[in-house]
Regions:
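Preference for long, amphipathic alpha-helical scaffolds in soluble/luminal domains
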Residues: 1-149
Length: 149
């Protein structure tokens, strides 16, 4: 359960992303499968609340925001890759632009704010978001991937 202090209360888009990955991993998309309705609602929730800067973290706390963004971005990318629904491309493109903007320009890592030296937990989520976006057909992820690796 949630910590009594409320820690994690504003990480709903990260949790939604993770739940979507479970549905997607079982073969469901927002168009097909016994849980298509659930996937459709989850994807709509993530994309409808996308911030102007491209973040999919919605109202996540500072230290949770980039984690939530990465999880949600992976879910959108995987849904696009599985369904071929081009309507998801603009949201994914904005999300990846945010991912790249948050990357440290020299070390290639991610942390909590632009320019922060990276840590491995953030690196994993953001690199997976880049790989998933590339696998979904998004072009231009390679320079950020190369900086990270």
């Amino acid at each position: 359960g949630q910590h009594p202090s409320g820690i994690g209360a504003k990480s709903d888009h990260g949790v939604t992303g993770l739940a979507l990955l479970a549905f997607l991993g079982a073969g469901n998309t927002h168009r097909e499968g016994p849980y298509a309705g659930s996937v459709a609602r989850g994807i709509a929730t993530l994309t409808a609340a996308q911030r102007a800067d491209g973040s999919l973290a919605r109202n996540a706390e500072f230290f949770a925001a980039l984690y939530c963004h990465g999880m949600a971005t992976i879910a959108v990318a995987e849904c696009l890759a599985m369904s071929g629904d081009k309507a998801l491309e603009p949201a994914l493109e904005r999300a990846i632009r945010h991912t790249v903007a948050m990357q440290h320009p020299q070390t290639g890592g991610w942390r909590y704010a632009p320019g922060d030296r990276g840590d491995t937990s953030q690196l994993g989520w953001q690199v997976m978001a880049l790989f998933s976006a590339r696998n979904a057909g998004l072009r231009g992820c390679e320079p950020a991937e190369a900086r990270a690796l």
